[in-house]
A protein has these predicted regions:
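FAD-binding core/adjacent interface of flavoenzyme oxidoreductases
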Residues: 58-62, 66, 90, 162-217
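Flavin-dependent oxidoreductase catalytic cores
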Residues: 1-100, 104-120, 128, 190-191, ...
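N-terminal Rossmann-like dinucleotide/flavin-binding domain of flavoprotein oxidoreductases
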Residues: 131-177
Length: 217
């Protein structure tokens, strides 16, 4: 018989195993999944499935750039293509670091700082981590983006990063704690044009709709 290799959107080792166990293929090939997390096979062997950074098939950094003749990147793995430059090493001195903002940039910054051996406290002014990326998971068929948030939240816990929800970083807070470094990752706000009737109650932003604060019928 001819060996069959299954390929395409297989980003979960449990799905890969299911394909093999059910006899649907002899081998499973992963491409983008290993760009997003090169350690996926090792984490699977060690039973650390919750630590896998799963590809979300955005294709923005890999396939789209490859077809354009550009160096590939990855939206959820900033190391791709710059592994040498971004090599994470232990700092010479342990520092106290404050991260302002609990979105993707804030959590990734906190993760790297902790891996370098620093004491990290992350402040998020809302009641949950994720920032505006939480809204990105709300539209239909975008639920898989939740994998990115799940991965980073697991990392926050695994690395012992102190999380302060419902607290905003201020000059007073920084003065009180006197950290060695402050990382500002407070995100962006919608650019609302200054045009007539913009304050009308019928005018809403995408942020409001996705957050459930406004409805469009």
């Amino acid at each position: 018989s001819v060996p069959v290799i299954a390929v395409g959107r297989i980003n979960d080792p449990e799905l890969a195993e299911k394909i093999l166990q059910e006899g649907k293929a002899d081998l499973v090939s992963m491409g983008r999944a290993l760009i997003a997390d090169p350690q996926l096979p090792l984490k699977t062997i060690e039973g650390r499935l919750e630590e896998i950074r799963k590809c979300v098939a955005c294709d923005y950094g890999c396939i789209s750039r490859l077809f354009a003749g550009l160096r590939i990147t990855c939206n959820i793995n900033p190391d791709v293509g710059k592994e040498k430059e971004y090599k994470i090493t232990r700092g010479e001195k342990v520092k106290n670091v404050i991260v302002a903002g609990g979105g993707l940039a804030g959590m990734e910054s906190a993760r790297v700082a902790a891996l370098r051996g620093h004491n990290v406290t992350l402040y998020e002014k809302t009641g949950e981590l994720g920032g505006q990326f939480v809204l990105a998971t709300k539209p239909p068929h975008k639920e898989e983006l939740q994998n990115v948030l799940d991965y980073l939240r697991v990392q926050m816990d695994k690395l012992g990063i102190r999380i302060e929800l419902g607290r905003e970083v201020s000059a007073k807070l920084v003065e009180e704690h006197k950290p060695d470094a402050v990382i500002v990752a407070t995100g962006a706000v919608p650019l609302v044009p200054n045009i007539p009737s913009i304050e009308d109650k019928r005018v809403v932003t995408a942020w409001d709709v996705l957050a459930g604060a406004a409805s469009v019928k």
